[in-house]
């Protein structure tokens, strides 16, 4: 999704903040945003706890359990961090210094990158699981899960390096009034980057998002083709029912497909809101709508996963 919240060359407020424009005066916007964050924290906490208990009790783990558990942990940390940052956006200036501003924005940036990466990995893994034995992807079915940890560590280091410029560009908002600062929160601002640095950073972000989203789209299309082919084969087998394993795989695949579709739609919506702020309107209301849209995926995704877990569904029904 768009990284415009903290890392765009566009200022988050195109005007100097004053008493009439600060977001903490918009109580409805503030309450809606914190409700979204609260629901997301609750859902991701429950999903993460479910997978931890599943591991401790020695239940048989599926290949997708690790990336799903990791995704819930990433989203939980990201939403908790955003809730803390939002107090400096919607409520009042907390007077953070340079170190706190750099740490919060840098960590948030890395978590957003890992969310995108883990979602892409989950989509690819589900495509590998669903692939038939005759497929070349089937050979990766038992190798891919063992390389997930290495991939996570590698990508974490990579994102930390890509985002390292934030440690230089983020500063505490000075008391002096200057028009060249780009506001992140009431306490934190971004120093303007040179054209070369801005172009290089934007290119790296674009390449990363295009690559990972392309992986998601290709794996999603591949799974759709496999499901359609499997359905046609099942229609020719009169009186033959699907095995429980096949049915479970199909349910898991449909969940991943729904989640990937939702992710892509939210990415498109996020880009539309971002472009509208850049080209037409950039006031506190449009800004708050943007950060609300940015966290819809992290809020909704745990409930999508939990809807397919029989144990959780039975507990909720009981």
Swiss-Prot record:
Residues carrying covalently attached carbohydrate according to the record: 175
Keyword Transmembrane: yes
Disulfide bonds: 101-188
Subcellular location(s) of the protein: Cell membrane
One GO cellular component term noted in the UniProt record for this chain: plasma membrane
Annotated GO biological process: response to pheromone; sensory perception of chemical stimulus
Cytoplasmic membrane side: 54-65, 131-150, 228-254, 307-318
Designated name of the protein: Vomeronasal type-1 receptor 45
Originating gene: Vmn1r45
